[in-house]
A protein has these predicted regions:
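Alpha-helical transmembrane segments of multi-pass inner-membrane proteins
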Residues: 3-14, 26-67, 72-140, 147-160
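Aromatic-rich transmembrane-lumenal/periplasmic boundary elements in polytopic membrane proteins
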Residues: 41-56, 163-180, 195
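Long extracytoplasmic/lumenal interhelical loops at the membrane interface
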Residues: 53, 172-187, 191, 195, ...
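Short, hydrophobic secondary-structure boundary micro-motifs
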Residues: 57, 94, 148, 167, ...
Length: 211
């Protein structure tokens, strides 16, 4: 596990050193943009062909009627949602770098595909994280648009699919076992901080779980 973190750190350093000008950054963002689109197409194909609801990932009693959650090329819908939340802002940044207006408009419209995929992951944490990312982006780039965005979000709520709206309502619900499991994890983390705050317990879940 430690090798994974070291490799990730070295990769980050390599990217920081390699992306030395705007053109290199644009090519890198183009690659990320295509990766986001590819996974979105895979997720949409999963929805069209059918993906079974997994009781190990969703409390089916608290989320009755919710279809299976897409995960694209990932094994877990929450992990896929994390991927989208991290890369969608970068994919959007790529569209703003396109000089041709038609190309920029087309590339921006295609981002509707990964947005739809994010909805179909039914990842509540992913939805909340993406909403916060949009708010931060607008705050620094188009602060005057924030009131309009909030109004549009409120008006869009009745237009959401019923399963999505019901999923939103379960955020913070104590009747959802997955929420209770998170509370259990947080409590365990606080105990770990009290007992091993200075030394830690090592990398990875294989060290976290037994402690």
């Amino acid at each position: 596990m430690s090798a994974f973190y070291v490799t990730s750190f070295l990769l980050a350093l390599t990217l920081a050193a390699g992306l030395s000008d705007r053109e290199k950054l644009k090519k890198f963002l183009a690659f990320l943009y295509l990766a986001v689109l590819w996974t979105a197409l895979s997720a949409i194909w999963q929805r069209l062909t059918g993906v079974a609801a997994n009781s190990s990932q969703t409390d089916l009693a608290a989320n009755a009627g919710m279809p299976g959650r897409v995960y694209s090329t990932f094994e877990n819908p929450n992990n896929y949602a994390e991927f989208l939340v991290l890369l969608l802002p970068l994919a959007f940044a790529y569209t703003t770098m396109l000089q041709n207006r038609r190309a920029r408009l087309g590339a921006t419209c295609l981002l509707a595909l990964p947005l739809a995929a994010l909805l179909m992951t039914y990842s509540r944490s992913g939805w909340v994280s993406f909403a916060l990312a949009v708010l931060v982006l607008l705050f620094f780039c188009q602060r005057r648009m924030l009131p309009l965005l909030l109004l549009a979000a409120l008006l869009a709520l009745p237009l959401l699919p019923g399963s999505v709206f019901r999923r939103i309502l379960t955020i913070g619900s104590t009747s959802d076992s997955s929420n209770l499991y998170r509370v259990y994890i947080w409590q365990g983390t606080l105990r770990l901080l009290r007992q091993f705050g200075l030394t830690g317990v090592g990398f990875g879940p294989e060290n976290f779980h037994p402690v």
